[in-house]
Amino acid sequence: MAKYFGTDGIRGEVANSTITVEFTQKLGNAVGSLINQKNYPKFVIVGQDTRSSGGFLKFALVSGLNAAGIDVLDLGVVPTPVVAFMTVKHRAAAGFVITASHNKFTDNGIKLFSSNGFKLDDALEEEVEDMIDGDFIYQPQFKFGSYKILANAIDEYIESIHSRFAKFVNYKGKVVVDCAHGAASHNFEALLDKFGINYVSIASNPDGLNINVGCGATCVSNIKKAVKEQKADLGISLDGDADRIIIVDENGQEIDGDGILNILAQYSNICGGTNGIVGTQMTNMSYENHYRANKIPFIRSKVGDRYVLEDLVKYGYKIGGESSGHVINLNFGTTGDGLFTAIQLLAIFSQADKPVSEFKLQGELMQQTLINVPLTKKVAREDLQKVASDVNDVEKRLGNRGRVLLRPSGTEPVLRVMVEADDKSLATNEAEYLVEKVKQKLV
């Protein structure tokens, strides 16, 4: 079981958990030393979101890397997918993002990309963890690394997207965008300006403390309200580091990551094409049934965009994502990318020329009840055997009317209990039954 890494990097409360200056410096030194061992290019890229703690954590990371002899190129405040993009483009050994994604400002963390722009696999994460727990390694003084700033990183990213989609995007509707006071602030607006989009921007004034506060992809009520007030045709909501996207139609109705994937699947010719779709264990069964009916191959991965990516590569598909809004298109990038996904959607909406509401899956979705159960410590998957018989009982009662998923959080001591059924009260009752069993046997 991983000691530091969760499903999406390392994350926690600043100064009151793993996320300290000392740890972050050791992480930089560990990765730098590993780069030396593997004879990779002695050069990495770093970026950050808008949290007040981002600056001092970044420089702790840089000091550990420089001591190990690694040169650092700092992109400043940029969305996470920009770091992945630039890591590949500039042939860096690795890319780091100082971010806690959709979490509150008191948290922070580090996301880490390998040279191909992919999140680290489990084996490489274990190597990094072993190095963190080892000695701090200094290179000889004449081999210390350098530190440089690249001010125009977002311009390279925007130009790459524009060159691919300029001929498709001609959207005439009014758009509201919610940048979560995060890394997309000003950067997303620059991208939309490049395509000539008529938009109103909200939650785009970061002060270091307001990231994700009452806004962003995990608080869709903000964008729903704004779409109605502005009489807009579309709402786009990103999270703090802009690797998630949720959209809202002209009626203020949410379309989550599952719904976005379905739109991309129906118009995959505009998005570069795909032989199938990768969702996750959380993907609503209604979409799985829809893909099957339309002869679109569909695979469920474990939750986490790194696992979506692994299955995209394994099965040779190009498009995948999560209900939460991580959407990956391997025709362009290697990680969840809210900005690029937004442009793909604007291209589709431009070409199809119908209201956003008409792109939604018709009919009622299966009803999901998700309950987070706090635990005293992180639970391993083998611990779930203690409630296996209870899960089996629920599955028997549901029959072919639904399904059950128990999933330990990868970032905190929480067990997520999800029951999906064709009736909301049935899903809720069975979920509450399982929560009681979990509290009796695991808490």
Swiss-Prot record:
The modification Phosphoserine is found at residue 101. The active site is at 101 (phosphoserine intermediate). It catalyses: alpha-D-glucosamine 1-phosphate = D-glucosamine 6-phosphate. GO terms for molecular function: magnesium ion binding; phosphoglucosamine mutase activity; phosphomannomutase activity. GO terms for biological process: carbohydrate metabolic process; peptidoglycan biosynthetic process; UDP-N-acetylglucosamine biosynthetic process. InterPro entries: A-D-PHexomutase_a/b/a-I, A-D-PHexomutase_a/b/a-I/II/III, A-D-PHexomutase_a/b/a-II, A-D-PHexomutase_a/b/a-III, A-D-PHexomutase_C, A-D-PHexomutase_C_sf, Alpha-D-phosphohexomutase_SF, GlmM_bact. Signal peptide: none annotated. Its cofactor is Mg(2+). SUPFAM superfamilies: Phosphoglucomutase, C-terminal domain (SSF55957), Phosphoglucomutase, first 3 domains (SSF53738). Activated by phosphorylation. One of its GO terms (cellular component) is cytosol. Binds 1 Mg(2+) ion per subunit. Mg(2+) binds at residues 101, 239, 241, 243. Keywords: Isomerase, Magnesium, Metal-binding, Phosphoprotein. Its EC number is 5.4.2.10. Belongs to the phosphohexose mutase family. PANTHER family: PHOSPHOGLUCOMUTASE (ALPHA-D-GLUCOSE-1,6-BISPHOSPHATE-DEPENDENT) (PTHR42946:SF1), PHOSPHOHEXOSE MUTASE (PTHR42946). Catalyzes the conversion of glucosamine-6-phosphate to glucosamine-1-phosphate. This is Phosphoglucosamine mutase. It comes from Francisella tularensis subsp. mediasiatica (strain FSC147). The gene is glmM.
